Amino acid sequence: MAEHPPLLDTTQILSSDISLLSAPIVSADGTQQVILVQVNPGEAFTIRREDGQFQCITGPAQVPMMSPNGSVPPIYVPPGYAPQVIEDNGVRRVVVVPQAPEFHPGSHTVLHRSPHPPLPGFIPVPTMMPPPPRHMYSPVTGAGDMTTQYMPQYQSSQVYGDVDAHSTHGRSNFRDERSSKTYERLQKKLKDRQGTQKDKMSSPPSSPQKCPSPINEHNGLIKGQIAGGINTGSAKIKSGKGKGGTQVDTEIEEKDEETKAFEALLSNIVKPVASDIQARTVVLTWSPPSSLINGETDESSVPELYGYEVLISSTGKDGKYKSVYVGEETNITLNDLKPAMDYHAKVQAEYNSIKGTPSEAEIFTTLSCEPDIPNPPRIANRTKNSLTLQWKAPSDNGSKIQNFVLEWDEGKGNGEFCQCYMGSQKQFKITKLSPAMGCKFRLSARNDYGTSGFSEEVLYYTSGCAPSMPASPVLTKAGITWLSLQWSKPSGTPSDEGISYILEMEEETSGYGFKPKYDGEDLAYTVKNLRRSTKYKFKVIAYNSEGKSNPSEVVEFTTCPDKPGIPVKPSVKGKIHSHSFKITWDPPKDNGGATINKYVVEMAEGSNGNKWEMIYSGATREHLCDRLNPGCFYRLRVYCISDGGQSAVSESLLVQTPAVPPGPCLPPRLQGRPKAKEIQLRWGPPLVDGGSPISCYSVEMSPIEKDEPREVYQGSEVECTVSSLLPGKTYSFRLRAANKMGFGPFSEKCDITTAPGPPDQCKPPQVTCRSATCAQVNWEVPLSNGTDVTEYRLEWGGVEGSMQICYCGPGLSYEIKGLSPATTYYCRVQALSVVGAGPFSEVVACVTPPSVPGIVTCLQEISDDEIENPHYSPSTCLAISWEKPCDHGSEILAYSIDFGDKQSLTVGKVTSYIINNLQPDTTYRIRIQALNSLGAGPFSHMIKLKTKPLPPDPPRLECVAFSHQNLKLKWGEGTPKTLSTDSIQYHLQMEDKNGRFVSLYRGPCHTYKVQRLNESTSYKFCIQACNEAGEGPLSQEYIFTTPKSVPAALKAPKIEKVNDHICEITWECLQPMKGDPVIYSLQVMLGKDSEFKQIYKGPDSSFRYSSLQLNCEYRFRVCAIRQCQDSLGHQDLVGPYSTTVLFISQRTEPPASTNRDTVESTRTRRALSDEQCAAVILVLFAFFSILIAFIIQYFVIK
């Protein structure tokens, strides 16, 4: 077994901060039981074996331990943790959780340094012993064999007892049948592997990067799990790390059976095979894990690709293993190995963060080679004529070193070496050398495999004579009580020669001469405990084994002076003035050993001011403080500066300057707008109050043309109102302030003008018409009333009450352009100043001279529909219209129409004209101008018009059907068949009430039905034909007359039974129709007769029918008859009959009211039945109409 690191002192670990958790677990029969102690990756567990030796087990590992008395050793609880008992499936566990929510494991480092005392009360199973760890930890400690040195610490710890394995409720630990069988099969496979591979469980720790172990170590804290064996409970100590810090997982998670089975598969891996073994390299090859365990195939799916981790150890089979490879390859080459070294290599399989148990260790030994390069030889002794060198043997790399080869350059320094010794000894003496001679040496080693490389070259000197006189020491830095000195080696001294130095010092006032202050090999020394500002003499002596040198030349250095003491408090010298005073002060009692170079005076304003400013710096001890403010407090202090530094400040002197009258104020300012007779002034305090508060103000006023000031206000307020002033007048004001010392000077004058009045009314302006479109307006300056006129406003317009501003400015004239000729215009002018606007002048009217007419606008063609001239023909005529232009003051006499002929056409004062005698289908360019007595106006814009071809003749119009509201007209009969193929459009017109013909129809059809006409009314119609050539002439007027209308249908009559043989029939009454009387015809049909018989005809709206028979059905209906009287004679127009009403005559039963009600209800029910019948017919008709329309839309149109 390889050497283990010695155990540290365990007393460093066991402190009172770690509480003790005792977890005894006793089985039911009280016999011995196996306890599994789980060790986390990177942690260690120290135990005592049967032979009495200690062993540290590194994680991850589970150490089975046998408890002779059925109890678990005490468990140390980290500071800030507390145990908690939880129950899971009938098993109680003790879990260590943090006491505070903000527990941070970084504050607990007590377990980093040394392991706990060993556990003597438990015997570990030999097959579960891992190699010694890097860090040794012990989560459990025996309580029975604890030595007395730990007892005081344990007395202050809290001990928590574990609970029984079975709960008090009688619940037992259970698994379902499938999980139980899988667990037993895995346990059997694990035991079989332990039987064939004795040292399987003592494998080194795997890589802690992705270890699935539930035990972690954070900042040195131990989190372990103690799982009980068969029929035992378990205790678990665990803490995790969350987002914000360390969190403790109080839940106990168990791996599912599939994960356990997969771990067993990953553990079934054979050891690697070493090949191509060299001195410093080796090739390792291995195979993936086998899916067969003891002849059985694992039920879990076998992955195609594994991850592997290779672990090697050079300290024995149970030594410390380290990870050298992590990847998916099955062979690697290890480099940087040590020659002739025994190595143990293991491989561990991994898949999806699940790791198996490492394989068995493959043992291989690297080959031997030449020795390593030795270290340079070191000098053991030197004289004037010899050097004795020694060296240490390097690593022999598996073969014993036979000879050492020592080479030197013979003191020549040319870089050429020769052998001076070869042998097995480790020292050699070189003789016959010269004093102070320098030689270079190098060393190599030789064994059976070859010679190593040479070591680094070293230079050594032989001893010489006594040292020469060194140079004088140099001052590097001086202090108040110390001096730092430095010196150098004497010239010609070998670099490796050991020389010592003696530093001697003499104080000039002591009289004792030079005394040694330092004796050693250093080249610098600081002499302390000196006096300030004092001169000291120094010299240095060098010596070696041969003797002492002569002393160096004496040098003299002076210590620094100390800072001076605090100066005396300054005092006032002479009288204190308002703006200055003089102060003086005395020097400090202690000047610090140096002359005072200067004094600095600082001053702060205010009795408690802390803002100090330097006002003086110099050697004199008095100063004049000037440029001060009257009536203010000032604090003064002084400090001094010498070569030793700056002293502290003295006590402060408080001085107050006397007050003076205040300084001048700023001129008063106007507040608000000035009024005509008063102004309001406001001012502020003076910038300088003279050191005393302002008590009052005085305001004086004088007219600007006279310098006769008079006081208008005196008081403490900062504003006043001055009244009784003249408007538009300028006044001068000045101000002064007063305090307890009197009035100060006046301020500068401030000129303020009272509010002026608006300007006076301007005189009527003068208007001069320069042309028909331009006029010049002039006006004069009115009285300004205290202010200058800034601008004038000229209003101009064609209506006296509606004028607009056409000019606004300082000028006295304005030219208005763009006027209309022969037009009356009105104008007025107004003056404005900064105060306001004066009244307008009187209104002046002017008339511009007349001119030629304006340009004719809106020249356009008149459409054929708008022309009422019967002689108009679009083929030979063109109708134009225009708007009358402005006559510009002279009446328009005529218009001149230019349409392309050599001579223009002149027409009278009209706005439309028909140009006749033109050529059909010809384009003409037409323009027009107006003429008056002054001449012709400009031509209008030109338009292009074209005459139409000759149109067809109108057809003959006739009435083919008529009613009292409709007339159906037809045309086109008798037309030649050749025209039937032409695309002729027809335009039907009818005369309205005003005697004008309006359009009724325009289209290709030959019939048209005129609707919504009045009865017995004559209407005039005319028609014209149109084709591509244009519209033909209108036909002659045709007159058609509508007949009179018949009365409307009446509602169903109402029947009321009078007695068994008489009933009364009533119906609605109609008004006379246009003066024609209306009579009624009542018909009845008895029983099953097929014809109605008239029983009444007359103007009444009711009739009593007295021929009723019992138990018979009667049907009644009525119609209205219009009696007309015209030129043809008397004529009756019979309207449609009403709805038939059924009446059944029955014998009247007493009481009479009951029978009447029965007849009434019967009549009503019959009437309602007929109405319902009509409604049903109407609904059915609407439904069929919609259905037919849908069919036509879907099958015909689409």
Swiss-Prot record:
Q: Where is the composition biased (Basic and acidic residues)?
A: 163-201
Where is each Fibronectin type-III domain found?
268-369, 373-465, 469-562, 566-660, 664-757, 761-851, 861-950, 951-1045, 1046-1151
InterPro entries, per this entry?
E3_ligase_FN3/SPRY, FN3_dom, FN3_sf, Ig-like_fold
Q: Which residues carry this modification: N6-acetyllysine?
A: K384
tRNA processing is among the record's keywords: no
Give the location in the cell. Golgi apparatus membrane
- Bias (Low complexity): 202-214
Which keywords fit this entry according to its UniProt record? Acetylation, Golgi apparatus, Membrane, Phosphoprotein, Repeat, Transmembrane, Transmembrane helix
The way it spans or sits in the membrane comes to:
Single-pass membrane protein
Keyword Zinc found: no
Q: Name one GO molecular function term.
A: RNA binding
Query: Which residue ranges does the record annotate as region Disordered?
Result: 160-221
Pfam families listed in its UniProt record? fn3 (PF00041)
| Phosphoserine carried by residues | S203, S207, S213
Tissue specificity of this protein: Expressed in the odontoblast and nerves in the dental pulp. Also expressed in trachea and to a lesser extent in the brain, liver, lung and kidney.
The text of the family note is: Belongs to the FNDC3 family.
Function summary: Mediates spermatid-Sertoli adhesion during spermatogenesis.
Protein name per its UniProtKB record: Fibronectin type-III domain-containing protein 3A
Q: Which gene encodes it?
A: FNDC3A
